[in-house]
Regions:
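Absolute protein N-terminus
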Residues: 1-2, 243
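ABC family nucleotide-binding domain
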Residues: 2-222
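C-terminal boundary and immediately downstream tail of ABC-type ATPase nucleotide-binding domains
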Residues: 213, 219, 223-243
């Protein structure tokens, strides 16, 4: 089953052409890793999937719903698409448990007790149930990012988007977040992940996409992508990020 379909997608920021003729199909359970230099359009691409960014040309269909200016359709898609950002975006004045139950209660109209049970299940899933009654400021960066993942999972998404989820973390915290994402991948979650963590890409990706100057330059399975990239721009990029 196709979960995300992008056809000839283009986007501009004023005169800047940030996405150029993007064509991409993602099937259920597929893990896609998107890499490329800074400013290449990686984050914009995945932010278009849940309409955090609006494309100006082409079609984007998510779980059978085409993204247009219809606000109800946008809301329907966002209920099914979880997103984890570079910065954790947790509410500092709410406890970890309250951060995780807010959307299920207000958006899905879930009863508080049920929402708390779901939240504790996913906090346990990301291995920090003991932090439930603390506030975000009391947690490490890695713990906060795992809370952000749990919070997204509480909405029972069909697709997870990750926008450089480890880039603002100290090196010793990166592994704990990547381990959580690897675990999600092994359970069959459909994932689109923007990251420079090439070891993660090798381990979990079904396909790796290299994007540069708003264009998909190369897309391939990890073994072929890393061992025999076809394009000079891909080879140049990999020579810089693989140490």
């Amino acid at each position: 089953m196709i979960q995300v379909e992008m056809q000839d997608v283009n986007k501009w920021y004023g005169a800047f052409h940030v996405l150029r003729d993007i064509n991409l199909t993602v099937t259920r359970g597929e893990r896609i890793v998107i890499c490329g230099p800074s400013g290449s359009g990686k984050s914009t691409l995945i932010r278009c999937v849940n309409r955090l960014e609006e494309h100006q040309k082409g079609r984007i269909v998510v779980n059978g719903t085409e993204l247009t200016n219809d606000l109800k359709k946008i809301d329907d898609v966002r209920r099914e698409v979880g997103m984890v950002f570079q910065h954790f975006n947790l509410f500092p004045h709410l406890t970890i448990l309250e951060n995780c139950t807010l959307a299920p209660i207000w958006v899905k109209k879930m009863q508080k007790r049920e929402a708390q049970e779901v939240a504790m299940h996913y906090l346990d899933r990301v291995k920090i149930p003991e932090q439930a009654h603390k506030y975000p400021g009391q947690l490490s960066g890695g713990q906060q990012q795992r809370v952000a993942i749990a919070r997204s999972l509480c909405m029972n998404p069909k697709i997870m988007l990750f926008d450089e989820p480890t880039s603002s973390l100290d090196p010793e915290m990166v592994k704990e977040v990547l381990d959580t994402m690897v675990s999600l991948a092994t359970e069959g979650m459909t994932m689109l992940c923007v990251t420079h963590e090439m070891g993660f890409a090798r381990q979990v990706a079904d396909r790796v996409i290299f994007i540069d100057a708003g264009q998909i330059v190369e897309i391939d399975e990890p073994d072929a992508f890393f061992s025999n990239p076809r394009h000079l721009r891909t080879r140049s990029f990999l020579s810089q990020v693989l140490h």
